[in-house]
Structures are given as structure tokens and as C-alpha cells.
């Protein structure tokens, strides 16, 4: 039987991004890719990201998070999921531990992130510094200027999309800036083609963004390993960084996604702050049948 059988989970969302939070602190249990795919496929625990909370690794941190996509792959960052974990560790009766000033320091394989409560249902996450060098994003070609890279969709003389910005927020992003509604593009078709493009050795999140004013952006996202999503916090952060580098906006903006709005600020110290909502939908336990045929 899988060690995940009968374990409790929280079903949450942040700006429409479906999140499942699983607490494995105090155990040596690790989620396998096959188990993550099984959880994602079940109607009761379907997610965009699975946030698994482990005991802290680095002294001074509150927990270590592993982040799984629906295809079982791991991600280094998930802003919406991090806000949900912040809520769980501060408010959930079964998970909460004492925390100073409603603030936590969490660790992922991409580094440290700080999360702080702003209101009862709103949290700010310090997503750290964006990575802008081609080899840090990473890309397979040595672009000296990642504000625009050579990539396009459609005919050479009349491309549908072209010259995206490239940014890493702990995971790679390509952002196409357009002058009409992002909903008018078939991102469900374009996204998977570009996600796996050879220029992205670790695959990439693909976004289409329209800057609608000096402090507002409309965004659609094809998420690496998950597909079309109602919201993606790291994509919102990457988009604000990219738009600011191109002088389309200042250093802060409200980003409108299909699932809701996120407020992003790229501070002078190079850290990116993301503020947004958290909603608890309910809780459940994993049925042993969910993992039938899977070795734990």
C-alpha cells in the first residue's frame, strides 16, 4: 500500500490556480511522479500544483516544499501554491506551528522564499531575484540580451507571435507581448509546442501578455507540466520583470489572469514581491484505491 493512502490533504486555490497541500513533516515519505499523477487525475484532489511540505532542511527555515505538476514533474517555484502553504502553516489546525508576526521562511529546490500574511485571506510572497542571464534561465543559445530572444510562431514574414522575453523566477518563462487581447490567441495549441522547444532545455512556461496601462497587464499562461491554467504566480512575476525591462511599465503592476488578480512589485533591491488571495475549498484523505498498482 502506498504510504500516502489515507493521508489528509487540503484543497485550495490562489487566484484560480488549483492547489493541493500535503503535510509530510515528521515522516521520511516522498511523493513519486506516479503518485503525483494519480492524485492529479482524481476528481477529489485534482490540482494544478501539488505542494508537499517536508521538515526544514536549512536552519532558520520553517519547512521545505516540493512542488509537483500534473504530469508528475517537479517545479522549483509556485507563487500561488506558496501563499496556500503559508495559509496552511499559519491557520490550519492540524498543520499550524507558532510563527513570528505571521511570517514564514520556506525552502524549495530553487532557493528560499518568504511569505507573510497581509490580511486574513491575502498573503505576500518574496519570490527572490529574477534570473536574466541566458545560462541561468536556462536557454540553449547564448543570447546576450534576454529582453527579446529569437523565437516565433507562424510564417517568417508574418508571425503570429515573435521575440518573447525570457526570465527565470526559479522556473523558466517566455513572455510574448502583444497588442490585442491575449484571449484571441490559441494558447492551448501554441503552448505545448513552445513549452518543449529545443531552446528551453528544461522546458518553459509560455505566456501571452497585453500591457493595458502603465500599471496593469492582462495575462494568459500555458504552464510547464500542467497546461492552460487560470493563474500562475511566477508567470505574473516574470511578466512584470520583463515589461519593466522593456520600459513598458514601471516596477509594479496589477496582473489580471482568468482566475483573478495578482499585485507584483519588482523592488529596488531586485526582489520580486507577489501579493494575492488564498481560498480554502476543503479537505480530504487519499483513498488507498487511488494508488492501486503503484509502488510506494
Swiss-Prot record:
It comes from the Bacteria. Its main location: cytoplasm. InterPro entries: DAP_epimerase_AS (IPR018510), DAP_epimerase_DapF (IPR001653). Keywords: Amino-acid biosynthesis, Cytoplasm, Isomerase, Lysine biosynthesis. PROSITE patterns: DAP_EPIMERASE. It is found in: Cytoplasm. It catalyses: (2S,6S)-2,6-diaminopimelate = meso-2,6-diaminopimelate. Pathway: Amino-acid biosynthesis; L-lysine biosynthesis via DAP pathway; DL-2,6-diaminopimelate from LL-2,6-diaminopimelate: step 1/1. One of its GO terms (biological process) is lysine biosynthetic process via diaminopimelate. SUPFAM superfamilies: Diaminopimelate epimerase-like. The record marks 173, 223 as: Could be important to modulate the pK values of the two catalytic cysteine residues. One of its GO terms (molecular function) is diaminopimelate epimerase activity. Its EC number is 5.1.1.7. One of its GO terms (cellular component) is cytosol. Substrate binds at residues 17, 49, 69, 79-80, 171, 205, 223-224, 233-234. The active site is at residues 78, 232. NCBIfam families: DapF. Catalyzes the stereoinversion of LL-2,6-diaminopimelate (L,L-DAP) to meso-diaminopimelate (meso-DAP), a precursor of L-lysine and an essential component of the bacterial peptidoglycan. Homodimer. Belongs to the diaminopimelate epimerase family. This is Diaminopimelate epimerase. It comes from Methylorubrum extorquens (strain CM4 / NCIMB 13688) (Methylobacterium extorquens). The gene is dapF.
